[in-house]
Amino acid sequence: MRRLCLFSGGFAIAAALYLFLLHDAPGVLLAALAAVCALLFLLRRPLVRRAAVCVLGLLAGLAWCRGYEALFLRPFEALSGKTAAFSAQALAAPQETSYGRSVSARLTLDGKSCTAVLYFDETDGEILPGSRLSGTAKLTTAQEKHARGNDYDLSRGVFLTASCRGPLHTEPGQASVRLAPAMLAERLRAAIRAAFPSDTAGFIQALLLGDKTGLSYEDKNDLAIAGIYHAVAVSGMHVSILLGMILLLCGGNHRLAAALGLPAAAFFIVMTGAPASAVRAGVMQALVLCAPLVRRENDPPTTICAALLVLLAQNPWALLNVGLQLSFASTAGIVFFAGGLYRSLSENRLLSRLLRPKNVLSSLLRAMLTALCCTISSMVFALPITALQFGTVSLAAPVVNVLALWMLSIVFCGGLLTALLALALLAAAGVCAWALSWPVRLVLLIVRGAAKLPFAALYLENGYLIAAAVFLYGLALLLALRPRAVRFWQAAAAALLVTACCMGLSCADYALPDSCFSMLDVGQGQCLVSRSGKSVSVIDCGGQEDASGETAARFLLARGVTQVDRLILTHFDADHCNGVRQLLRRVRVKTLYVPELSPENGLRTKLLFAAAQAGTEIRFVTDDLTLPDGMRIFAPTGSAEEPNAGLCVLAAGEKYDILMTGDLSEQAEYRLLSTHDLPHAAVLVAGHHGAAASTSEALLRAVKPEAVLISVGADNRFSHPADETLRRIAKAGAAVYRTDLSGTITIRG
């Protein structure tokens, strides 16, 4: 089996080289590799022959990458940006998005077919797996997104996205064996919603099907912070539990388990959308179960490499998928290091005594110890990827996995059987679902409690926290490679001490200057953080929905700020306040300042209710206010019906003043200037994200800013900032700093 390992490894290396280095390499390189491969095979030495197998994998990988691009990607390049009529077949049920709905479909256009995602607002019928779809849409290719740095679609084998122009027409489709997994998934979703209580149905749906639409943003974020998000993203864990359950039902008969389990696992993987981690686990488990049947020994490196070969043969660009990278990195760490770590820990005198008896307590302890060893081992290769991709390292992960993973195994098996039972006997399934909901609630309680801890995760916002992450990685590596070199309690104490020191340095670095002002990168929105002395203020908190509130919370927590003195909302547009609820969940806010003249709307009502629930004092601003740290809040000068009416804020510092005008229009700026004697402000936050109707010449002349900050999303659909605004700022002689170009902007003084 090692030859398969060498060939698969060479194939994977070739795919990585092609995607990152040799994409435009000439064909002569393939010819040279072919010549080297042939020469090596002519030599009879075993070591050379093995090298030849690896080179053959390299040759096959490079040739397949080039052929795949020519066969499946280039035929669609000419369609990018065009609007055309199409026909398609739905591959799954539609999902809600921020701007409407989307559905995965097999799209046919000019005689060419490919997997695509259709975005639409309205349809003339119900969409089910197999439904025939037609309409007119603007097309965007995966290559165009790849050129802009977005590899998500390409890594999933989605070659086109189509934004419908007008209604999407639907017709009932014909049932087919190919769509049976998707149709069963839809029936299971309905069964889960019918059988399980509303507070646990979303979690069960995510655990069994990988469909996280029933989970709130808050729960998904808590799962990520607690380091157990993999539980609701169908992965190798789910496939392993499924096959383990089938093996148990087969009484340990490996032949029968292989005969029943492999088709069941394949069906489950397709039903859940064939995520890379599940496919990887399916291939690995198939090799493990089949190895004894063909009189071969299981070889972990071979199973890992073979699984990667299957995925890359299907789509070489899958290597760009973060889920695939994390799945293989975690699995490699567990395969190579978990066993040795478990043996080392189980040799501890106290643990060995507890593990020796064969009873329920020792079985539970073994499961928890296994979870701990797997969690630490998985970090060896996965932690750098997590840190680079997400900028977060969960410190709570080892503890949460120990406490919750064994319960999730029970919940997965019970939930799957209950959902299947609900298809036939809903009443009986309801009783099982009620009982199964209690361990689900316990898991969620553990996750939410862990996520609320002040240091549940490291947010890699500065060099101190990056240093802590590097130390933790080195410690995990040491425990995995040489488990007997250091005692576990010593490693835990060192981790706590170093993390605490780095957090202390991070807090001191933020607190040392007299004042600090930051414009956070929240996309197309605005969130500003101002600190003067010990007083911390957040002005607006909106952008990419709840993510803007989480961005603000992580910025504050990384600097040791767990309490905000005041949150000031200039107005109630979503891009200035839709992250408030998440911010209130993550940090304590003492006082909320809002404009009195804001017209009633649903978002305003929800935010005020959330603030009241969080114990935050609410103050409606009807007159100008001067706060103890010198910050001034200017009340609205217009009526409630005027668009973009709201508060203005002037943050006063020893070295500079900063003026923030929210979304004030040019007319509102004139009224502000006529009713207030504004000082010269070194920094001006451009109104309305740099829109043409804000940041007027009159305001620029009065304030005389040295720098203008613009909070704006990259490639936003509003074309902010406007060219006219940039010309006015340049004419005023001020420098421009934009979050879409520079990320988070910080001024220290």
List each language-model region with its residue ranges.
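Core dinuclear metal-dependent hydrolase active-site scaffold
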Residues: 212, 312-320, 448-566, 612-683, ...
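Active-site HxH/HxHxD metal-binding segment of metal-dependent hydrolases
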Residues: 574-611, 705
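N-terminal leader/targeting segments
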Residues: 1-76, 184, 280, 479
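Hydrophobic alpha-helical transmembrane segments in multi-pass membrane proteins
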Residues: 2, 22, 36-37, 53-55, ...
